[in-house]
A protein has these predicted regions:
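Short helix-initiation/N-cap motifs at beta->coil->alpha
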Residues: 81-90, 109, 181-188, 264-279
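Extracytoplasmic/periplasmic substrate-recognition and gating elements
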Residues: 174, 259, 301-366
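Conserved N-terminal structural module of periplasmic/extracytoplasmic solute-binding proteins
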Residues: 3-14, 23-116, 132, 348
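Short, solvent-exposed loop/beta-turn-alpha elements that line the ligand-binding surface or hinge
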Residues: 124-136, 142, 222-247, 300-306, ...
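Extracytoplasmic/periplasmic solute-binding protein
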Residues: 146-157, 162, 187-237
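A local structural motif
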Residues: 71-81, 99, 173-178, 254-269, ...
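Glycine-centered hinge/linker elements that transmit conformational signals in sensory
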Residues: 190, 234-266
Length: 366
């Protein structure tokens, strides 16, 4: 048996994580498949130890990685772990140099270009042969496809980038049994909350990605619908200059600039800061991703049982002039597990990489 050496490069705390889970353990045991490969296998991801504290999704991902590692003692699993923002920069640099890790997180927007450059292994047949294939929501594959080919394993159970977390007791006092389904009603409620010195909805865009990922991704769909999105990613005519998408931008500008719904410092604070406004009671609601949801859930469960028992969840409210799915949300993940195309030259190593990808996105993580 080869002596294993672990190299964990942890840089800063991550700002997002795959999936949502309130448990800090694998949902099912990792499949201990017999693998012929004996050697090093590298994975690059952004689930830092700091991020895993209070984030069930991040903690679960790390737990499954550790379980897979322990189940395969002849394989040295080398983890290169960076913060989310650092990860995006580093993975782009490695792609430009043609030196991607064996296994890594693929962002949907990079799929087509990197596939055309021959950097990504076509996983279509491997995914179809996966023991978990029938359990996948086929829509999760869309951002990671080029034509009919699939280049990433999405998590079996997707999270959401856009969830409203609200204090049911506070909204009850404002006259609402549930969180409003329209922005018009949210704006009306803000009059009450402002009189109480409470922020209606906390939001943080300090990282300059939250407004797009956690808000516009869902708001835009309320105006454009799913067909426009598919046309955009397939480059079949849809454009960000289309009237219906411009209408979504106009509504977003109105909500953040012309109303008093959100905290005034939304563009200066991060999602981590904004969710603390909700936790402390300074805000009656918060909008963020499933990673924020799991952090809030865990924090309140430990420190404030009353507020924890009053947690409510809702989808993004519907704008008055939007005509598409009023209850839609941004389901799925911004990343999938991808494999370096170079591994095709080493069948045993490739089999190990496929096994790893299947397990860290399958039932053990879901």
């Amino acid at each position: 048996m080869r002596t294993r050496t672990k190299r964990i490069v942890a840089l800063l705390a991550g700002t997002a994580m795959l999936g949502s889970s309130f448990a800090s353990f694998a949902a099912t045991d990792v499949a201990a498949n017999d693998l012929a490969y004996k050697g090093e296998l590298e994975i690059m991801h952004y689930s830092t130890s700091e991020e895993s504290e209070g984030n069930g999704g991040s903690d679960g991902f790390r737990t499954v990685l550790q379980a897979w590692d322990e189940a395969h003692p002849d394989i040295t699993l080398t983890q290169n772990v960076l913060a989310n923002a650092e990860y995006k920069t580093q993975i782009a640099t490695l792609a430009a140099a043609g030196d991607l890790p064996d296994v890594f997180l693929l962002q949907g927007m990079n799929t087509k270009d990197w596939a055309k450059q021959g950097l990504l292994l076509d996983l279509t047949d491997y995914i179809k042969e996966s023991p978990y294939y029938d359990e996948y929501d086929q829509n999760y594959f869309t951002p990671f496809k080029d034509g009919d080919s699939v280049y990433g394993y999405p998590a079996l159970t997707g999270g959401t980038c856009t969830v409203v977390v609200y204090d049911k007791a506070m909204w009850k006092e404002a006259g609402y049994d549930t969180f409003p389904s329209t922005w018009e009603d949210v704006e009306k409620a803000s009059e009450y909350f402002n009189e109480q010195g409470v922020t209606t909805v906390a939001f943080g865009n300090g990282g300059k990605w939250q407004a797009n990922s956690d808000f516009l991704s869902t708001l835009g769909n309320r105006y454009t619908g799913p067909d426009w999105f598919l046309s955009l990613i397939n480059k079949e005519g849809a454009a960000f200059t289309d009237d219906k998408f411009v209408a979504a931008l106009t509504e977003m500008q109105h909500l953040f600039q012309d109303t008093q719904i959100f905290n005034e410092d939304f563009n200066a604070v991060t999602n981590e800061d904004a969710r603390e406004y909700y936790i402390s009671g300074e805000a009656a609601a918060f909008i963020g991703g499933n990673w924020d949801e799991s952090y809030i859930w865990a924090t309140l469960k430990e420190n404030d049982s009353d507020k924890w028992n009053n947690m409510g969840f809702a989808v993004l409210p519907q704008p008055a002039d939007a005509t598409e799915a009023p209850t839609s949300q941004n389901i799925g993940l911004g990343y999938a597990i991808a494999i370096n195309a170079k591994l095709a030259d080493d069948p045993d190593k490739l089999a190990a990489a496929i096994d790893l990808a299947q397990e860290i996105t399958g039932p053990a993580f879901a």
